Amino acid sequence: MKAKDIRKKSQEELQKELVELKAELFKLRFQHATNQLENPMKLRDVKKSIARIKTVLRERELKGIEV
């Protein structure tokens, strides 16, 4: 997910997306540990998406904006 798309979403949508991505990351880590993960790059992509969402949420917190 691109940062531009993330910035268009509301606070609640971002919180929901963050929870979903964290759950997906948990599943992927478990699959990776048991050697069932076909594409290890998926781990990196999910981690980066989580970081992007957290960054946007923090920016909004500092600005005091709730879009």
Swiss-Prot record:
PROSITE patterns: RIBOSOMAL_L29
Protein family according to the UniProt entry: Belongs to the universal ribosomal protein uL29 family.
Assigned keywords, A-Z: Ribonucleoprotein, Ribosomal protein
The name this protein goes by in its record: Large ribosomal subunit protein uL29
Taxonomic superkingdom: Bacteria
A GO term from the CC aspect: cytosolic large ribosomal subunit
Encoding gene, per UniProt annotation: rpmC
Keyword NADP: no
One GO MF term: structural constituent of ribosome
A Gene Ontology BP annotation from the UniProt entry: translation
